[in-house]
Amino acid sequence: MRLTNEQREQVITLRRKHSLSEVASLAGLSLGSVKSIISRSGLFTDNPRHRAMFTLPPLQSSGETLPAVPELPPQEVVTGDKEIDALLWLRQVIGTGDPVRIAQAKEAAGRITTPSDELEKRYGKWLVGKGGHVLAGLGSIGFANLDGLAKRSIERRANEAEAIGRFGDALWDDTQAEAFCLESLRGLETETWDYPPELVAERFKAHPELMPHTLSDCLHELAYWDDLYRLRRACSKDYDTHQEVWSRDQFIFTVMLAELRPRNRDEARATLRHLLDSERRDWKEVDRILDNLIG
């Protein structure tokens, strides 16, 4: 029997919400015919054009060099408390991200015998006196935790090196993926800070060649946006992403993770693991994603 284009489209539409056997039953076709249509469509395997667009450039060993470690900051009298001022200076040294200086700073901090909680109380009291209100004292939380600061500083330095190794002088230029988002949503007006989700979905779905075909594609793109933000943020605390990029990221998370059926248990498990690790796990849209994974 020769299949019509309408039958093929019906099979593809049904497959997005049903198993292969259910599609065969609903479409009145043999399981073999359904599998053939799905395979030939290419819509249920990873989209190579999508992957190419949403992939960071490779690390270049011969790329730009990391900015030199800043000179040691001068030791200054800030609070008048010698131990507190010493810690403030050591925190600046650790903030350079240089492993050698960090090790030296932590060694020097070990010679301060006052308990860390006492140091934080004294620093908090000074902050309150300077700021004129109790909330100012919150700035002392974790003040004496040099190990945590050292870990963050080393991670930031590593991210800076990766950012320069991948992008060089083009770090702040819009990537192809960002340019695509800007162009796709050009002319849309925001409503209460965000673009209307329905119109965002319509605009992006108008470019099927750059749509994710699988949940794995979705996870790949979400990781791309996370990594791009991580690398740029390490180089500038003032960096923030385009509103259009944020809308694309939301669209992939809230819409596509809920629409694209998992191809197998491994893909469903990977998506669930992403949800559990995500800061968005409490969003109301997560229920639809869970229904998609276990439905």
PLM regions and their residue ranges:
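Charged, low-complexity interaction regions
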Residues: 233-243, 261-262
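Short, solvent-exposed alpha-helical "recognition" segments
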Residues: 2, 20, 35-54
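Long amphipathic alpha-helical segments with strong coiled-coil/leucine-zipper propensity
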Residues: 93, 99-233
